[in-house]
Every structure is written in structure tokens, then in C-alpha cells.
Design a protein with these regions (language model features):
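Conserved alpha/beta-hydrolase
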Residues: 44, 49-75
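Alpha/beta-hydrolase-fold enzymes
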Residues: 120-203
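Catalytic active-site module of serine/aspartate enzymes centered on a nucleophile-bearing elbow/loop
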Residues: 263-301
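Alpha/beta-hydrolase fold nucleophile elbow
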Residues: 103-114
């Protein structure tokens, strides 16, 4: 698989964003744009991208600001350079436009994971007419404490600064996720090898800065704000998937609540699935072949 790595300049603030492009060997049947999760990077999706390219899909994935190579220095991991969430959302909008320029007249599919689903849902509110299908994988469900969390984060920023790696907010947000599990970050995946690689990767699992947490909480609040949905593409096919043992979805009731929230906004073509025995990173589970196949079926139907 040939990977073309490029830099594009964010139209929001001039930050350099690193983008990887993969073309299939046969004529492309569609384009999959990715929106990755928190405290990880684009390279973790290359196995799935290889699978999609073998089935005729071109793929475009960038490192979100504050992640991977979309930082000014390694010390900026978890720092977004702004507290305006429109920047990370419109970065995605720009990458979708970039993908369209590379592969004109092809359907655009958006695959998003975890925090990336918050970005894609905020993107959806403004730009749903730009894409042809949407996958939400491991999506955070509604947390009604998001507003309070923003206030706490701003207060913490007054004392510690915006670039402070905020262990307190990290514990408040994720402290319960690993309950009952032995290995560090075992909540992300039942596949022990995946967890081991994640823990050994310096571009994964870093603690967000206070600025990063403010952005995260704002994304959560905006994604579940009932106001501001244009719904220009009401019949957009949406596929919502998660592991039954994923703490990010909280529970099945909250997961079903997310699906209902999108239906209530006006989207009428939503399917969902929970995978038994799987945790947060469906693409990296031992039985990921089933997930790969299900997503592919959704993309091609």
C-alpha cells in the first residue's frame, strides 16, 4: 500500500496539518475520510485503510490538531492552539474539501471514532450536504455535566495555564474507565496486543492539556446541543457502532439515546449495532474482521 503524506495549512489559524492519502490500485469507487479519536494518530488506521483500499476505496486521514504530526512540537500534544472548537471542526471540513479535490465526482464517506465522532457530529450540523455516508464508531454518549466541566477546566486554566497537562481533569473524565481491569488502558480494547502497542506509543495516551480538555468538553456540549442543526441531508445514511463493553457509550440506554437524538434532529436513515465482548476500539479487536466486513457492507450498499 502506497501512502502519500502531505501537509496542508489550516485555513483557521495557519497550523500545519499532516494528511495521508491512499489510492486503490483499481479505479476508486468512493472516498473514505477519517476523523480519529482522542490521544492517538492517523497511522493507527492504516490496517483498516489497507482493507478499504483493497475493496476500491480511496482514503484520506489527517492528524487532528494537537495530535500526531499536527503539532508545532511534540510538547504540544493535547494542545489545540485555540479554544474555538470551530477550528477543529472546520479543519475536518477543509480535509473533506481536499479529498473532493483529489477525487472529484466520487461519493464521500466519513468514518469517525470516539472524540472524532464529536468532531464529525459538530461538522454534521453545518456541512451534512457534503458527505454521502457517516459512520460513528465508539461515540461518546451525552454527558449532561459537560457545561460544568467547561467551567472547572476554565478555573483550572486560571491557576495552571492552558498548556498544563491536566491530570486532575483526566482523572475526573476517564478515572472510572479501567475499573475492574488490570492492564493500563485495558478499557480501550480486549485485544491485549493492541493495548500493549498503545501504551508503548509516545503519540498515544498522552494527557490532554487544560486547553485540550476545554475543547473536548465544548465539542461534547455542541454535539448534543439541539439548536443549530441545518439537516440539509435528512436521508444521509448513518451507521452507529460500539462495543457492548465500551465505557465511552456508558450503557445501551445511553447508546440508544444517541441514536434517538440524531433521529429527533431529522435524520431518517440510521442503523446501529453493539458488538458483544468488544470494548472501545472496534477496529483493533481480535475479531475485527466482523467489524471490517460490516462497515464495508454499509459503505458499498
Amino acid at each position: 500500500m502506497k501512502i502519500d503524506v502531505q501537509k496542508i495549512t489550516s485555513q483557521q489559524d495557519g497550523l500545519e496539518l499532516e494528511v495521508a492519502v491512499v489510492k486503490p490500485q483499481s479505479p476508486a469507487v468512493g472516498v473514505v475520510v477519517f476523523s480519529h479519536g482522542m490521544a492517538e494518530h492517523k497511522e493507527r488506521y492504516f490496517d483498516f485503510i489497507k482493507y478499504l483500499s483493497q475493496h476500491g476505496f480511496a482514503c484520506v486521514i489527517h492528524d487532528h490538531r494537537g495530535h500526531g504530526q499536527s503539532v508545532k512540537s511534540e510538547s504540544d500534544l493535547g494542545y489545540f492552539y485555540t479554544q474555538n472548537i470551530n477550528c477543529i471542526v472546520d479543519d475536518l471540513h477543509q480535509v473533506v474539501g481536499f479529498a473532493k479535490s483529489l477525487f472529484p465526482n466520487l461519493p464521500i464517506m466519513l468514518f469517525s471514532h470516539s472524540m472524532g465522532t464529536l468532531v464529525s457530529r459538530c461538522y454534521l450540523k453545518k456541512y451534512d450536504g457534503e458527505i454521502d455516508k457517516l459512520v460513528l464508531c465508539g461515540p461518546p454518549t451525552e454527558n449532561k455535566m459537560a457545561g460544568l466541566a467547561i467551567c472547572i477546566a476554565h478555573l483550572s486554566q486560571l491557576f495552571h495555564g492552558k498548556k498544563h497537562a491536566n491530570k486532575m481533569l483526566n482523572k475526573l473524565t476517564f478515572g472510572s474507565y479501567n475499573k475492574g481491569l488490570e492492564a493500563e488502558n485495558a478499557w480501550i480494547c480486549a485485544n491485549e496486543e493492541t493495548v500493549k502497542k498503545y501504551n508503548e506509543d509516545k503519540l498515544c495516551g498522552f494527557i490532554f492539556t487544560t486547553n485540550g480538555f476545554i475543547n473536548l468538553f465544548k465539542l461534547m456540549k455542541q454535539a448534543f446541543n439541539k439548536k443549530g442543526w441545518s439537516v440539509a441531508h435528512a436521508d444521509l445514511p448513518i451507521y452507529v457502532i460500539a462495543g457492548e463493553e465500551d465505557p465511552v457509550i456508558q450503557n445501551q440506554k445511553a447508546f440508544d439515546g444517541l441514536v434517538k437524538f440524531l433521529r429527533d434532529r431529522g435524520y431518517n436513515d440510521i442503523n446501529s449495532k453493539l458488538y458483544a465482548g468488544m470494548r472501545h476500539e472496534l477496529l483493533n479487536e481480535i475479531d475485527n474482521a466482523k467489524v471490517y466486513s460490516d462497515v464495508l457492507k454499509f459503505l458499498v450498499k
